[in-house]
């Protein structure tokens, strides 16, 4: 009633589920100067504090920004998703400082592939396809997007490491038409999402 809803929308207090991705970007960009300052003091300190906040939110998902439309708060909890942002900034700073991407450690590559295979089997909708449920952990594992559960974070980190440590993947991304188009989509991810 009245124009109270306008104020709620402008203050990001009325966000329908998946539509708070834009406000999430704004909050992350607004918090960037703080993270950058912490990185200038000590890169490990910045990552440690960011990781501690992420872990706190994973232990208590109720720690979230308020949302008038959803009593659980923002669908994409900025207090959790900031850690992925922090990991990306730290990885970028690290590779820029070294002048190259991550070293390819065979044991770590194997671990990433094994985890991603497990993740694919666990996430596949077996019963929707009329197949027997082959998920190793069944319903016991339900990774949340809202507070960036560890399983979702591991997915992203494993894929990131496999790409950033592979000369072949970098060459494919730089030289192939598909790789260049994917890079173009990535540079315009907000517009693509909207």
Identify the role of each PLM range.
Residues 1-194:
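Alpha-helical transmembrane segments and their immediate juxtamembrane cytosolic regions
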């Amino acid at each position: 009633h009245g124009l109270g809803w306008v104020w709620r929308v402008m203050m990001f207090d009325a966000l329908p589920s998946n539509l708070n991705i834009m406000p999430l970007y704004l909050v992350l960009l607004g918090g960037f100067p703080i993270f950058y300052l912490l990185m200038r003091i000590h890169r490990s300190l910045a990552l440690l504090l960011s990781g501690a906040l992420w872990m706190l939110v994973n232990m208590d998902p109720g720690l979230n920004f308020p949302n008038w439309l959803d009593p659980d708060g923002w669908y994409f909890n900025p207090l959790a998703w900031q850690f992925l942002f922090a990991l990306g900034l730290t990885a970028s700073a690290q590779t820029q400082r070294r002048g190259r991407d991550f070293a390819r450690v065979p044991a770590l590559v194997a671990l990433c592939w094994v985890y991603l295979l497990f993740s694919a089997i666990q996430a596949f909708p077996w019963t929707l396809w009329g197949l027997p449920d082959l998920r190793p952990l069944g319903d016991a594992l339900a990774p949340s997007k809202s507070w960036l559960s560890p399983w979702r974070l591991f997915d992203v980190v494993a894929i990131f490491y496999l790409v950033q440590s592979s000369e072949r993947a970098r060459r494919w991304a730089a030289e192939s038409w598909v790789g260049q188009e994917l890079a173009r989509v990535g540079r315009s991810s907000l517009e693509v999402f909207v």
